[in-house]
């Protein structure tokens, strides 16, 4: 998606350790109009698929997922929580994932009330690096008996291989911007064509 790539080049910052900072418009301050355009792009890509639920992971995916849901008939958005809390009651699906950004493992939890057998789920997230978070969400869907219809990613770090691995496993991954390489010394970002 050219618009997203242009925003990344204009407002993104390449940091050491393969970190791409896009907090000016994607995952701290949110550009809702951009999210709306992203939703339209995913609605076009996943046209013809039954989507009756969107699943993401807290926190950065929530804003994107809520705007995207409007393009799929206002389907419910469920977000996996990263920590147990007193608000989470009843039966739950739980797995553990490794966060590239946070450099640690954490639990991801979804109430069994909100992820059900027979659901047709679109996974949405802001970033895809090594794919561990998405694999955790996929595991939760499989445990629930839900079908993963597709995966919508704002920014994929193509050089980290997670997206390619998910595609090889048969998942329909639509990344709107795939970063092929980044250089923190001169700030350059190259996209996959």
From Swiss-Prot:
GO terms for molecular function: xanthine phosphoribosyltransferase activity. Belongs to the purine/pyrimidine phosphoribosyltransferase family. Xpt subfamily. It catalyses: XMP + diphosphate = xanthine + 5-phospho-alpha-D-ribose 1-diphosphate. One of its GO terms (biological process) is xanthine metabolic process. 5-phospho-alpha-D-ribose 1-diphosphate binds at residues 129-133. Homodimer. Xanthine binds at residues 20, 27, 157. It comes from the Bacteria. This is Xanthine phosphoribosyltransferase. GO terms for cellular component: cytoplasm. Pathway: Purine metabolism; XMP biosynthesis via salvage pathway; XMP from xanthine: step 1/1. Its EC number is 2.4.2.22. Gene3D superfamilies: 3.40.50.2020. Its main location: cytoplasm. The lineage of its organism: Bacteria, Bacillati, Actinomycetota, Actinomycetes, Bifidobacteriales. Signal peptide: none annotated. It comes from Bifidobacterium adolescentis (strain ATCC 15703 / DSM 20083 / NCTC 11814 / E194a). It is found in: Cytoplasm. Keywords: Cytoplasm, Glycosyltransferase, Purine salvage, Transferase. Converts the preformed base xanthine, a product of nucleic acid breakdown, to xanthosine 5'-monophosphate (XMP), so it can be reused for RNA or DNA synthesis.
